[in-house]
């Protein structure tokens, strides 16, 4: 493993101290906000660097004690144990510093647009899509995020043919960005009389929420259609033309929202969804051309990739990208154990990024 960039680390520590002094002198307005944000960004890595330097000083002292205790077996044993402990701590802190120095995904702190669509499997696929959507909304509730449904198309027996929702909360994208892909379920459907296990699938897409400045949309490039909202069976459920469909002509991207009775609110939601999709398309194109980033991905990043299987008869969940199996299906589907899959995925992603940085 390559040595840490000590000169850069010293610069970060010095900059952190400089900002702290400026804040204590009473910076105001936008300057205060800017400095406060930079101070918060630097604090984690600076704390790790200081802890690392403290551990290195402690190791020097432990090595000196070890050298002086050659004639005292008991003291030597204690010194050897302390040296080993400090070496392990230094290695862990050095890894933490390297991780803190990795380039951050600018979208990580944002909320998300969550899209869940039933795949192969008919009614059972729609029911499973509903299970996945509820799993994510329960997880969002645990994290203190709010959920706003943008559009939905219910299945004939329940669940969803498609549902799109915004999950508003800091860090939602960082936690859920690796949920994109094909999720497969194996279980006996409620309508199955012979007890046979069926396999169905649903596709999940996680997009970072887009801000106005992220995507430049020319009004002339949009075709906006309004129509009467329809229910699950195709019947009209609204006497006014409140549903909105927006087509971005240059990319032929189409979004439609009909959940609100207000055409104005539906249009605002549709524009938010359109911005997110256009931003995501642009990010996908950029990432496809970056070999180092491809190496740093968990899985292929392709939304047609099968990423996870939920086997109900065995109570098993398997994430195929990292060969992780948990026998906690009920807890995962309830959202309470989803972090036990997400955390290893993030760890694997960080390890891949570190390896790519080492090779660069």
UniProtKB/Swiss-Prot annotation:
- What domain of life? Bacteria
Is this entry keyworded Protein biosynthesis? yes
| GO molecular function annotations of the record | translation release factor activity, codon specific
Q: Which residues carry this modification: N5-methylglutamine?
A: 235
Q: Where in the cell is it found?
A: Cytoplasm
Pfam family example for this protein? RF-1
Q: Where is the composition biased (Basic and acidic residues)?
A: 284-308
Taken from the UniProt entry, a GO cellular component term is: cytoplasm
Asked whether the UniProt record includes Cytoplasm among its keywords, one would answer yes
Alphabetic keyword roster:
Cytoplasm, Methylation, Protein biosynthesis
- What is the protein's major site of localization? cytoplasm
Q: Outline the segment boundaries, as ranges, of region: Disordered.
A: 284-310
> Cross-referenced InterPro entries, in alphabetical order?
PCRF (IPR005139), Pep_chain_release_fac_I (IPR000352), Pep_chain_release_fac_I_sf (IPR045853), Prokaryotic/Mito_RF (IPR050057), RF-1 (IPR004373)
Job description of the protein: Peptide chain release factor 1 directs the termination of translation in response to the peptide chain termination codons UAG and UAA.
Q: Which NCBIfam families match?
A: prfA, PRK00591.1
Protein name from the UniProt record: Peptide chain release factor 1
């Amino acid at each position: 493993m390559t040595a840490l960039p000590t000169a850069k680390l010293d610069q970060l520590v010095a900059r952190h101290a400089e900002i702290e002094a400026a804040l204590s002198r009473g910076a105001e307005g936008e300057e205060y906000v800017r400095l406060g944000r930079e101070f918060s960004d630097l604090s984690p890595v600076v704390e790790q660097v200081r802890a690392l330097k403290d551990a290195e000083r402690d190791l020097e002292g432990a090595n000196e004690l070890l050298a002086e205790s050659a004639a005292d077996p008991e003291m030597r044993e204690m010194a050897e144990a302390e040296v080993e402990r400090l070496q392990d701590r230094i290695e862990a802190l050095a890894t933490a510093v390297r991780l803190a120095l990795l380039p951050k995904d600018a979208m990580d702190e944002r909320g998300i647009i969550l899209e869940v669509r039933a795949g192969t499997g008919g009614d059972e696929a729609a029911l499973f899509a509903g299970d996945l959507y509820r799993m994510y909304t329960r997880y969002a509730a645990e994290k203190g995020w709010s959920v706003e449904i943008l559009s939905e198309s219910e299945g004939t027996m329940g669940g969803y043919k498609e549902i799109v929702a915004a999950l508003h909360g800091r860090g939602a994208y960082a936690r859920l960005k690796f949920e994109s892909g094909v999720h497969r379920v194996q279980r006996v459907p409620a309508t199955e009389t012979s007890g046979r296990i069926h396999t169905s699938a649903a596709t999940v897409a996680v997009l970072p929420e887009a801000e106005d400045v992220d995507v430049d949309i020319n009004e002339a490039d949009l075709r906006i259609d309004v129509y009467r909202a329809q229910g699950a069976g195709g019947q009209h459920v609204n006497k006014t033309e409140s549903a909105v469909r927006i087509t971005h002509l240059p990319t032929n991207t189409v979004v439609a929202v009909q959940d609100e009775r207000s055409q104005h609110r539906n249009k605002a939601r549709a524009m938010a969804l359109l911005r997110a999709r256009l931003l995501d398309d642009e990010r996908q194109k950029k990432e496809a051309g970056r070999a180092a980033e491809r190496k740093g991905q968990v899985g292929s990043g392709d939304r047609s990739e099968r990423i996870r299987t939920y086997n109900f008869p065995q109570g098993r969940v398997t994430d195929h990208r990292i060969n992780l199996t948990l026998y906690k299906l009920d807890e995962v589907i309830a959202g309470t154990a989803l972090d036990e899959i997400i955390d290893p995925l993030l760890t694997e992603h960080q390890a891949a990024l570190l390896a790519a940085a080492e090779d660069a």
